[in-house]
Design a protein with these regions (language model features):
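Phosphate-binding/switch region of NTP-binding enzymes
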Residues: 56-62, 67, 172-263
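Short, small/acidic-rich helices and loops at N termini and domain boundaries
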Residues: 1-17
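The Walker A/P-loop phosphate-binding site
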Residues: 12-113
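Conserved catalytic network of the ASCE P-loop NTPase/AAA+ motor domain
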Residues: 49, 86-89, 117-118, 145-147, ...
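Conserved, well-folded catalytic cores of nucleic-acid-processing
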Residues: 75-79, 113-116, 161-164, 181, ...
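Acidic, gly/ser/pro-rich intrinsically disordered tails
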Residues: 267-271
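Conserved inter-motif catalytic segment of the P-loop NTP-binding fold
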Residues: 60, 89-173, 249-254, 259-266
């Protein structure tokens, strides 16, 4: 991939001077007027998921990671307070990339969001399963340029941007690219990654990089006694955390938090 630029002794003095000026421009002083983090959503009353940062959603296979993410997406595109757990601070546009599932399975995610919100405005869903890792990366960059109003990029299957999740160099390059995208496009990037079967860690070197660089890591686990119930908890995070909570899939096929709360919204409800 060679995303990391290597030194070239043949570079002209003009090129080196230009790079030095770019580096010096990145100095941060206490008196600088710097834009503060823009948080897109609260869990409970705790701000999470800011633009310019990355989150990780991890869990074993079939733990309902995508269902958990569906609540996140519905709250954002609908500007909802969903079960008083996923509380959007603003209406957001979401570019959702799925790398694992068939077109019909990807469509079902869109249909669930539409049922929860009332429409699918602001949700741009793409299934990139047929592409190679390199072409998936190229496709995502093209889509970010196409959907210029994107606030959140979701990569459901970030390991599919790599040939080998245990390759340290490749993992560092992909994570470096994600950080660059989050900065260049001023977006939040939510990544989904499988968890190791023998422990609670994210899989591979890409998982280690994600743990080190992410603003927050959420783990989704299936209940040990009732397989219809899953739990969401924060295992790593900056700032204040939130209490673990549970959800299940209703008879209508929609995820719902297990509590006494119902859906409310800061804007006129679409239903």
């Amino acid at each position: 991939m060679e995303l990391i630029k290597k030194s070239n002794d043949a570079e002209t003095p003009e090129v080196k001077k230009s790079f030095l000026e770019d580096v010096l421009s990145k100095r941060i002083k206490s008196t600088d007027n710097i834009k503060q983090n823009e948080y897109l959503l609260k869990i409970d009353n705790t701000n999470k998921f800011s633009k310019g940062n990355i989150s990780g959603w991890i869990g074993l296979a079939k733990s309902k990671k995508t269902f958990a993410l569906t609540m996140f997406v519905a709250a954002l595109v609908g500007h909802l307070k969903l079960y008083a757990k996923f509380n959007a601070n603003t209406k957001a546009n979401v570019l959702y990339i799925d790398t694992e599932q068939s077109p019909s399975d990807v469509q079902r995610i869109t249909q669930r969001v539409k049922k929860m919100v009332g429409n699918e405005e602001g949700l741009f869903m793409y299934g990139l399963r047929p592409l190679s890792p390199k072409l998936r990366i190229e496709a995502i960059e093209l889509l970010l340029k196409e959907h210029k109003t994107t606030d959140v990029l979701i990569i459901d299957g970030v390991r599919d941007l790599l040939m080998d999740i245990n390759n340290a160099v490749e993992s560092t390059e992909v994570m470096t690219l994600l950080m660059k995208w989050s900065f260049d496009y001023d977006i939040h990037i939510a990544t989904v990654l499988h968890q190791n079967k023998n422990g609670g860690d994210s899989r591979g070197h890409i998982g280690t990089e994600l743990n080190n660089k992410a603003e927050t890591i959420l783990r989704i686990t299936k209940d040990e006694t009732d397989g219809s119930i899953s739990h969401i908890e924060e295992v790593f995070g900056r700032g204040k955390g939130f209490d673990k909570f549970s959800f299940q899939v209703s008879d209508d096929g929609l995820p719902e938090v297990l509590s006494e709360y119902s859906i409310t919204t800061d804007i006129d409800a679409p239903f």
